From Swiss-Prot:
Keyword Glycoprotein listed: yes
Cystine connections: 78-89, 128-136, 138-155, 206-220, 208-215, 280-311, 296-306, 310-350, 326-341, 328-338, 333-334
Annotated compartments: Secreted, Extracellular space, Extracellular matrix
Species this protein is from: Homo sapiens
Subunit architecture: Interacts with PORCN. Interacts with PKD1.
Annotated protein name in UniProt: Protein Wnt-4
Length: 351
């Protein structure tokens, strides 16, 4: 192997190790709770944290259970959004949680980083509003009368605190490296796009006050959207993600569209550096599990259909017995009683 090839291989290895480690904090999702463990046991022994995250943990121990919930939210939402895709957001019980897929600069990695940073911002914000954290509470900057004539009142979600904590905790590895590498720039951009997905979908919730349900006075507050809505928004951004490449702009490096004919991406868009594998066949070196054995939809022409999901390999069909509730009746008072029925269904799995 030539010296140039050796250097390139070494760079790729460092790139992969750095990229995987940047998302290792997601291993917190595998824990049942971090809130009941003392500081000494918690922060030093939590798997997947780099030293600066350990220090943040020590300074913000009460917030760490929200970070864990945010990681869980992110993984669950990723698996929901990709449940019918060739890559279905499978996780491992080791580091990195999503396997080697996140070590590559693909659009799948872009989604993982975006939904993860959004998960932390969301969970910390909700913890602030629910009174779980001493360091933050409701957003008191939202007050007075709105231009629409309603009174700002109640507990507005403190999204500013949630976003700031997510930036400090999730972005720390990339920022500690100076954010100069292509992958660091990609990760930071997608982290911010995830948080933007919450900010752009913040909503106003209101309550009417008056005699007999009239709305003489209406009080309103700002609330984060349901996390499912955030997941849908980021999935749309995934489908329209922009392939980029690093370029020096002035004295700094920036990511620009690889195809000059494409319009520049915005802060809310996802970006990626390299095309994705097809995820058809198992390749443990790149962390691809393949689609063999996956359940498919025989009648669908979409990606969940047997033709596309099974990558043209065909599929097996089996008759399976499904247990389900049936003949349900309401009994006074107050419960529903059902029978357990067996139903034969066809199950199709990829060859």
């Amino acid at each position: 192997m030539s010296p140039r090839s050796c250097l390139r291989s070494l760079r790729l290895l460092v790139f992969a190790v750095f990229s995987a480690a940047a998302s290792n904090w997601l291993y917190l999702a595998k824990l049942s709770s971090v809130g009941s463990i003392s500081e000494e046991e918690t922060c030093e022994k939590l798997k997947g944290l780099i030293q600066r995250q350990v220090q943040m943990c020590k300074r913000n121990l009460e917030v760490m259970d929200s970070v864990r919930r945010g990681a869980q939210l992110a993984i669950e939402e990723c698996q929901y959004q990709f449940r019918n895709r060739r890559w279905n957001c499978s996780t491992l019980d080791s580091l990195p949680v999503f396997g080697k897929v996140v070590t590559q600069g693909t659009r799948e990695a872009a989604f993982v980083y975006a939904i993860s940073s959004a998960g932390v911002a969301f969970a910390v914000t909700r913890a602030c509003s629910s009174g779980e954290l001493e360091k933050c509470g409701c957003d008191r900057t939202v007050h007075g009368v709105s231009p629409q004539g309603f009174q700002w009142s109640g507990c507005s979600d403190n999204i500013a605190y949630g976003v700031a904590f997510s930036q400090s905790f999730v972005d720390v590895r990339e920022r500690s490296k100076g954010a100069s590498s292509s992958r660091a720039l990609m990760n930071l951009h997608n982290n911010e796009a995830g948080r933007k997905a919450i900010l752009t979908h913040m909503r106003v919730e209101c309550k009417c006050h008056g005699v007999s349900g009239s709305c003489e006075v209406k009080t309103c507050w700002r609330a984060v959207p349901p996390f499912r809505q955030v997941g849908h928004a980021l999935k749309e951004k995934f489908d329209g993600a922009t392939e980029v490449e690093p370029r020096r702009v002035g004295s700094s490096r920036a990511l620009v569209p690889r195809n000059a004919q494409f319009k520049p991406h915005t802060d809310e868009d996802l970006v990626y550096l390299e095309p994705s594998p097809d995820f058809c066949e198992q390749d443990m070196r790149s962390g691809v599990l393949g689609t063999r054995g996956r359940t498919c939809n025989k009648t669908s022409k979409a990606i969940d259909g047997c033709e596309l999901l099974c990558c043209g390999r065909g599929f097996h069909t089996a008759q399976v017995e499904l247990a389900e509730r049936c003949s349900c009746k309401f009994h006074w008072c107050c419960f529903v009683k059902c029978r357990q029925c067996q139903r034969l269904v066809e199950l199709h799995t990829c060859r």
